[in-house]
Amino acid sequence: MKQYLDLCKRIVDEGEWVNNARTNKKCLTVINADLVYDVGNNQFPLVTTRKSFWKSAIAEILGYLRGYQNAADFRALGTKTWDANANENQAWLDNPNRKGPDDMGLIYGALGRAFPKPDGGHVDLLQQIVDDLSNGIDNRGEILTFYHPGAFDLGCLRPCMYEHHFSLLGDTLYLNSTQRSCDVPLGLNFNMVQVYVLLALMAQITGHKPGKAYHKIVNAHIYEDQLEPMRDVQLAREPFASPKLIINPKIKTLKDIETWVTLDDFSVEDYQHHDAIKYPFAV
């Protein structure tokens, strides 16, 4: 929690104003932030200075792992995070590649589970990684990427957290996640949960102990209409102790994640938090 608040304060104190063309808003911005989550010791990085809807964050990462590309599928899992970008993003609404209401296109897990090959085929990057790690293999390239510049026009939004690199040391699994852009007040509390859960789940289904997850953010920003509640409300609150995340130990395989896992398979213990803060969302 401290590293999250330190980043928020750093942006408020040291950030520079940048005009964002996509949203037509100004952002208070810093470059480069590195966060670390101790998954092995169950130090769950859930924000306590406001209520965080952790179930929605987990539903979103589950949707990525399943390769979903329709906002309705994400809603069925338990999150509405893609409703706006699928249905209110004017550039996507005007894109001839959009297939209709709720279509998100080729983004995130939909790309990672079927990464295009030059010969017209596809590679399931996630399945390859799971197969390798399950057999104790780390080829120094166990990378799940969602970033393909040639496919940007096929989706409603470029991936923000675009790469997850898994590494084995002995029987301990580590994760390095890279994020090109981060809406810190709204997005980071979700992204921290997702990086943590991704390592915890991947370690569990490949038979390894989870180690630490390293989360690099390149462009970290606070939108102009988010600055006041962040500076005057959230940063003025004292954080509570970190809660614990419990994952159903019956989740054993990638197929389990793809077929029957729901939010009921996750629970959080001892989550004490301040009141929610409604931050504006930039589409």
Curated annotation (Swiss-Prot):
Reactions accelerated catalytically: dUMP + (6R)-5,10-methylene-5,6,7,8-tetrahydrofolate = 7,8-dihydrofolate + dTMP
Domain of life: Bacteria
Keyword tags: Cytoplasm, Methyltransferase, Nucleotide biosynthesis, Transferase
Annotated catalytic residues: C160 (nucleophile)
Signal peptide: none
Entry EC number(s): 2.1.1.45
One GO process term, biological-process aspect: methylation
Alphabetical list of InterPro entries matching this protein: Thymidate_synth/dCMP_Mease (IPR045097), Thymidate_synth/dCMP_Mease_dom (IPR023451), Thymidate_synth/dCMP_Mease_sf (IPR036926), Thymidylate_synthase (IPR000398), Thymidylate_synthase_AS (IPR020940)
Compartments it resides in: Cytoplasm
Record pathway: Pyrimidine metabolism; dTTP biosynthesis
GO terms for MF: thymidylate synthase activity
Complexes and interactors: Homodimer.
Family to which the UniProt record says this protein belongs: Belongs to the thymidylate synthase family. Bacterial-type ThyA subfamily.
The protein's name in its UniProt record: Thymidylate synthase
Gene source species: Shewanella frigidimarina (strain NCIMB 400)
Lineage summary: Bacteria, Pseudomonadati, Pseudomonadota, Gammaproteobacteria, Alteromonadales
